[in-house]
């Protein structure tokens, strides 16, 4: 109930008014069944604008700290994050990453629409970075379809480090569903999982038009911070020639 109130009464109408959004390919999202929406990640705003344009409820995993803070502020945070479709993930255990994967897999198996960002964190410069293989593990273990989602322009609405949201026209592109059922039973094979992840990132690259960089976004942030501190470090440019073989251009299988 809270989710739909947030979407259609409290937040949704305002977002739709201030940020007109062109939506392409929404019909690619199955009307029923467990599905993974795998998106590029440009800004915090992604998790607001994308669910707003999807008919079904979208669930995102979120750190449990958002739901356990004491006092009135904590209650408001819990209400808000529950309302926008996020569920708590306990990251305090020794195997927090596995706990997150297990929760995400369970949600898809139960027929939910799961939102996930394979890059693992926001892009520091608007480029598309190497995907983490957790998305492949979830797809294999849940047997859910993967729909690539390209967010375009949210980094201009909500730039990293900015507390303001600026009026801009946005675009959200939903790609053709990817079916990895041909790999049933191969969860845990790191080569298969990497190949599947690369196929998803390739689809995102084509859908978004972003330049692809074959390192993790978290590493890119480290390099950018080092460069800002005066250390000679540089985020690699898009490879060409033989180096381009490292770009995820071969689809799994």
List the predicted regions and their residue ranges.
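Short, basic, glycine/proline-bearing loop/turn elements
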Residues: 10-12, 83-91, 118-122
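Hydrophobic alpha-helical segments typical of transmembrane helices
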Residues: 9-10, 46, 76, 134, ...
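Alpha-helical membrane-targeting segments
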Residues: 1-18, 70-85, 163-169
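Short gly/ser/thr-rich secondary-structure transition/capping motifs
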Residues: 16-23, 96-98, 155-156
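Short beta-strand-to-loop junctions in surface cap/lid or active-site-entrance loops
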Residues: 23-29
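Non-catalytic C-terminal accessory region of glycerolipid acyltransferases
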Residues: 2, 98-253
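Catalytic core of membrane glycerolipid acyltransferases/transacylases, capturing the structured
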Residues: 16, 29-94
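Generic structural signal for residues in well-ordered beta-strands
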Residues: 21-23, 86, 172
């Amino acid at each position: 109930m809270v989710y739909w109130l947030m979407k259609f009464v409290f937040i949704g109408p305002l977002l739709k008014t201030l940020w007109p959004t062109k939506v392409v390919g929404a019909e690619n999202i199955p009307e029923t069944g467990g599905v993974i929406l795998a998106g590029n990640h440009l800004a915090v705003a992604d998790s607001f604008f994308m669910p707003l344009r999807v008919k079904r409820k979208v669930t995102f995993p979120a750190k449990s700290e958002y739901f356990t803070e004491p006092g009135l502020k904590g209650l408001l945070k819990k209400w808000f994050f529950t309302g926008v479709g996020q569920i708590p993930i306990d990251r305090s255990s020794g195997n927090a990453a596995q706990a997150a994967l297990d929760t995400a897999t369970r949600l898809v198996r139960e027929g939910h629409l799961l939102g996930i960002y394979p890059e693992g964190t926001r892009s520091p410069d608007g480029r598309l970075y190497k995907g983490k293989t957790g998305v492949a593990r979830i797809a294999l273990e849940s047997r859910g379809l993967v729909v690539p989602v390209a967010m375009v322009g949210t980094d201009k609405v909500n730039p990293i480090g900015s507390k303001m949201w600026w009026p801009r026209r946005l675009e959200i592109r939903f790609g053709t569903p990817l079916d990895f059922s041909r790999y049933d039973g191969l969860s845990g094979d790191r080569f298969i999982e990497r190949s599947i992840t690369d196929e998803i990132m390739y689809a995102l690259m084509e859908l978004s038009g972003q330049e692809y960089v074959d390192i993790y976004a978290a590493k890119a942030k480290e390099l950018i911070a080092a460069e800002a501190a005066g250390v000679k470090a540089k985020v690699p440019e898009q490879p060409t020639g033989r180096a381009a073989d490292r770009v995820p251009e071969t689809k799994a299988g």
